[in-house]
Amino acid sequence: MGFYAPAQIVRDARDHGVNVLHPDVNYIGWDCDLEPQSNGELALRLGLRQIKGLRQQDAMLIEQNRKSGYSHPRELISRAGVQLSTLELLARGDAFQSMELSRRQAFWTVRGIANSTFDSLTEKDSGLPLFSNNKESYSNKTSHSEPKVSLPIASIGEEVIDDYNTLKLSLKSHPLALLREDLSGSSYKAISILENLADGSPVLLAGLVLVRQRPST
Protein backbone atom coordinates (compact mmCIF):
# COMPACT_ATOMS: atom_id res chain seq x y z
CA MET A 1 0.00 0.00 0.00
CA GLY A 2 2.63 2.46 -1.08
CA PHE A 3 4.02 4.49 1.80
CA TYR A 4 2.86 2.11 4.54
CA ALA A 5 5.10 -0.77 5.58
CA PRO A 6 3.57 -4.25 6.06
CA ALA A 7 4.21 -3.99 9.81
CA GLN A 8 2.03 -0.87 10.00
CA ILE A 9 -0.80 -2.43 7.99
CA VAL A 10 -0.74 -5.63 10.05
CA ARG A 11 -0.67 -3.69 13.32
CA ASP A 12 -3.66 -1.59 12.26
CA ALA A 13 -5.57 -4.69 11.13
CA ARG A 14 -5.00 -6.40 14.47
CA ASP A 15 -6.03 -3.25 16.33
CA HIS A 16 -9.32 -3.48 14.42
CA GLY A 17 -9.93 -7.08 15.44
CA VAL A 18 -8.52 -8.88 12.40
CA ASN A 19 -6.81 -12.19 13.19
CA VAL A 20 -3.48 -12.24 11.31
CA LEU A 21 -1.72 -15.58 10.80
CA HIS A 22 1.92 -16.41 10.13
CA PRO A 23 3.15 -17.55 6.69
CA ASP A 24 3.11 -21.36 6.53
CA VAL A 25 4.03 -23.79 3.74
CA ASN A 26 0.86 -25.82 4.33
CA TYR A 27 -1.61 -22.94 4.20
CA ILE A 28 -0.52 -20.21 1.83
CA GLY A 29 1.24 -19.43 -1.45
CA TRP A 30 3.01 -16.28 -2.55
CA ASP A 31 0.26 -13.76 -1.82
CA CYS A 32 -1.60 -13.03 1.39
CA ASP A 33 -5.12 -14.45 1.53
CA LEU A 34 -8.21 -14.76 3.70
CA GLU A 35 -8.54 -18.04 5.59
CA PRO A 36 -11.79 -19.37 7.11
CA GLN A 37 -11.69 -20.00 10.85
CA SER A 38 -13.59 -22.50 12.99
CA ASN A 39 -15.73 -19.66 14.39
CA GLY A 40 -16.97 -18.76 10.91
CA GLU A 41 -14.88 -15.61 10.65
CA LEU A 42 -12.03 -14.92 8.24
CA ALA A 43 -8.39 -14.46 9.21
CA LEU A 44 -5.64 -12.86 7.15
CA ARG A 45 -2.86 -15.33 6.36
CA LEU A 46 0.40 -13.62 5.42
CA GLY A 47 1.89 -14.87 2.15
CA LEU A 48 5.28 -16.45 1.63
CA ARG A 49 6.25 -13.22 -0.17
CA GLN A 50 6.81 -11.79 3.29
CA ILE A 51 9.86 -14.03 3.85
CA LYS A 52 13.00 -12.12 2.91
CA GLY A 53 14.86 -13.62 -0.05
CA LEU A 54 12.22 -16.19 -1.03
CA ARG A 55 11.52 -16.39 -4.77
CA GLN A 56 7.98 -16.24 -6.14
CA GLN A 57 8.72 -19.25 -8.35
CA ASP A 58 9.55 -21.39 -5.31
CA ALA A 59 6.42 -20.26 -3.48
CA MET A 60 4.34 -21.26 -6.50
CA LEU A 61 5.99 -24.70 -6.66
CA ILE A 62 5.29 -25.24 -2.97
CA GLU A 63 1.63 -24.33 -3.39
CA GLN A 64 1.12 -26.32 -6.61
CA ASN A 65 2.57 -29.53 -5.15
CA ARG A 66 1.07 -29.26 -1.67
CA LYS A 67 -1.92 -31.58 -2.31
CA SER A 68 -2.97 -32.89 1.12
CA GLY A 69 -0.10 -31.12 2.83
CA TYR A 70 3.57 -31.51 3.72
CA SER A 71 4.47 -33.50 6.83
CA HIS A 72 8.25 -32.89 6.77
CA PRO A 73 10.50 -30.20 5.26
CA ARG A 74 12.24 -32.80 3.04
CA GLU A 75 8.96 -33.26 1.13
CA LEU A 76 9.36 -29.77 -0.30
CA ILE A 77 12.46 -31.09 -2.06
CA SER A 78 11.04 -34.42 -3.23
CA ARG A 79 7.62 -33.07 -4.26
CA ALA A 80 8.02 -29.38 -5.00
CA GLY A 81 11.61 -29.55 -6.21
CA VAL A 82 12.89 -26.56 -4.24
CA GLN A 83 16.51 -26.17 -3.19
CA LEU A 84 17.98 -26.55 0.29
CA SER A 85 18.63 -22.81 0.32
CA THR A 86 14.88 -22.28 -0.01
CA LEU A 87 14.23 -24.60 2.94
CA GLU A 88 16.66 -22.54 5.01
CA LEU A 89 14.80 -19.34 4.14
CA LEU A 90 11.50 -20.96 5.10
CA ALA A 91 13.00 -22.22 8.37
CA ARG A 92 14.34 -18.76 9.20
CA GLY A 93 10.90 -17.39 8.35
CA ASP A 94 9.29 -19.82 10.84
CA ALA A 95 7.09 -21.20 8.05
CA PHE A 96 6.97 -24.80 9.32
CA GLN A 97 4.71 -24.21 12.33
CA SER A 98 2.02 -26.54 10.95
CA MET A 99 4.59 -29.36 11.28
CA GLU A 100 4.97 -28.45 14.96
CA LEU A 101 8.52 -27.27 14.32
CA SER A 102 9.79 -24.13 15.98
CA ARG A 103 12.15 -21.91 14.04
CA ARG A 104 15.19 -23.52 15.67
CA GLN A 105 13.85 -27.05 15.24
CA ALA A 106 13.06 -26.38 11.59
CA PHE A 107 16.51 -24.98 10.88
CA TRP A 108 18.12 -27.94 12.68
CA THR A 109 16.02 -30.32 10.57
CA VAL A 110 16.96 -28.56 7.35
CA ARG A 111 20.65 -28.68 8.23
CA GLY A 112 20.22 -32.41 8.87
CA ILE A 113 18.79 -32.79 5.36
CA ALA A 114 21.75 -30.86 3.97
CA ASN A 115 24.23 -33.12 5.79
CA SER A 116 22.41 -36.26 4.60
CA THR A 117 22.53 -34.99 1.02
CA PHE A 118 26.27 -34.29 1.28
CA ASP A 119 26.92 -37.76 2.74
CA SER A 120 24.91 -39.40 -0.04
CA LEU A 121 26.79 -37.54 -2.76
CA THR A 122 30.12 -38.42 -1.13
CA GLU A 123 29.22 -42.11 -1.00
CA LYS A 124 28.14 -42.09 -4.65
CA ASP A 125 31.29 -40.30 -5.77
CA SER A 126 33.44 -42.84 -3.94
CA GLY A 127 32.21 -45.58 -6.27
CA LEU A 128 30.86 -47.73 -3.46
CA PRO A 129 27.86 -49.86 -4.50
CA LEU A 130 25.97 -48.76 -1.42
CA PHE A 131 22.92 -47.58 -3.36
CA SER A 132 23.13 -49.79 -6.41
CA ASN A 133 20.64 -52.37 -5.11
CA ASN A 134 18.99 -50.25 -2.46
CA LYS A 135 15.26 -49.91 -3.12
CA GLU A 136 14.70 -47.31 -0.43
CA SER A 137 14.23 -43.80 -1.69
CA TYR A 138 16.25 -40.88 -0.45
CA SER A 139 13.33 -39.61 1.58
CA ASN A 140 12.83 -42.96 3.28
CA LYS A 141 16.53 -43.28 4.01
CA THR A 142 16.76 -39.92 5.73
CA SER A 143 13.48 -40.18 7.61
CA HIS A 144 15.11 -42.16 10.43
CA SER A 145 18.64 -40.79 10.28
CA GLU A 146 18.15 -37.43 11.99
CA PRO A 147 19.37 -37.39 15.60
CA LYS A 148 16.91 -36.51 18.34
CA VAL A 149 18.08 -33.40 20.13
CA SER A 150 16.64 -31.02 22.67
CA LEU A 151 17.23 -27.49 21.47
CA PRO A 152 17.07 -24.52 23.85
CA ILE A 153 13.83 -22.56 23.55
CA ALA A 154 14.32 -19.10 22.06
CA SER A 155 13.31 -16.16 24.22
CA ILE A 156 10.50 -13.92 23.06
CA GLY A 157 13.09 -11.23 22.37
CA GLU A 158 15.07 -13.55 20.12
CA GLU A 159 11.89 -14.58 18.32
CA VAL A 160 10.90 -10.97 17.66
CA ILE A 161 14.37 -10.08 16.38
CA ASP A 162 14.37 -13.11 14.06
CA ASP A 163 10.88 -12.19 12.84
CA TYR A 164 11.93 -8.66 11.94
CA ASN A 165 15.09 -9.93 10.24
CA THR A 166 13.11 -12.32 8.02
CA LEU A 167 9.56 -10.90 7.82
CA LYS A 168 10.08 -7.21 8.69
CA LEU A 169 7.34 -7.63 11.31
CA SER A 170 6.38 -9.91 14.18
CA LEU A 171 3.05 -11.38 15.22
CA LYS A 172 4.51 -12.61 18.51
CA SER A 173 5.15 -9.25 20.13
CA HIS A 174 6.27 -5.70 19.43
CA PRO A 175 9.91 -4.74 20.10
CA LEU A 176 8.87 -1.86 22.35
CA ALA A 177 6.57 -4.13 24.36
CA LEU A 178 9.73 -5.87 25.55
CA LEU A 179 11.16 -2.52 26.70
CA ARG A 180 7.98 -0.93 28.05
CA GLU A 181 8.64 -1.82 31.68
CA ASP A 182 12.11 -0.27 31.59
CA LEU A 183 10.87 2.81 29.73
CA SER A 184 7.84 3.39 31.96
CA GLY A 185 10.03 4.35 34.91
CA SER A 186 11.58 7.24 33.00
CA SER A 187 10.22 10.26 31.14
CA TYR A 188 9.10 8.13 28.19
CA LYS A 189 5.32 8.17 27.83
CA ALA A 190 2.82 6.01 25.98
CA ILE A 191 0.91 7.82 23.25
CA SER A 192 -2.35 6.69 24.84
CA ILE A 193 -1.83 8.97 27.86
CA LEU A 194 -0.60 12.11 26.08
CA GLU A 195 -4.08 13.66 25.99
CA ASN A 196 -4.19 13.51 29.78
CA LEU A 197 -0.97 15.47 30.29
CA ALA A 198 -0.91 19.17 31.02
CA ASP A 199 -0.22 21.49 28.12
CA GLY A 200 3.49 22.07 27.69
CA SER A 201 4.55 18.99 29.67
CA PRO A 202 7.94 17.68 28.51
CA VAL A 203 7.79 14.09 27.29
CA LEU A 204 10.02 11.58 25.56
CA LEU A 205 8.70 9.08 23.01
CA ALA A 206 10.29 5.84 21.88
CA GLY A 207 9.39 4.05 18.67
CA LEU A 208 10.57 2.18 15.59
CA VAL A 209 11.63 3.74 12.30
CA LEU A 210 9.86 1.57 9.72
CA VAL A 211 10.11 3.85 6.70
CA ARG A 212 12.51 6.73 6.12
CA GLN A 213 10.79 9.36 4.03
CA ARG A 214 13.01 10.90 1.36
CA PRO A 215 13.13 13.80 0.99
CA SER A 216 12.30 14.47 4.62
CA THR A 217 9.48 16.86 5.50
Predicted regions and their residues:
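Noncatalytic, beta-rich nucleic-acid-contacting surfaces in large DNA/RNA-processing enzymes
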Residues: 1-217
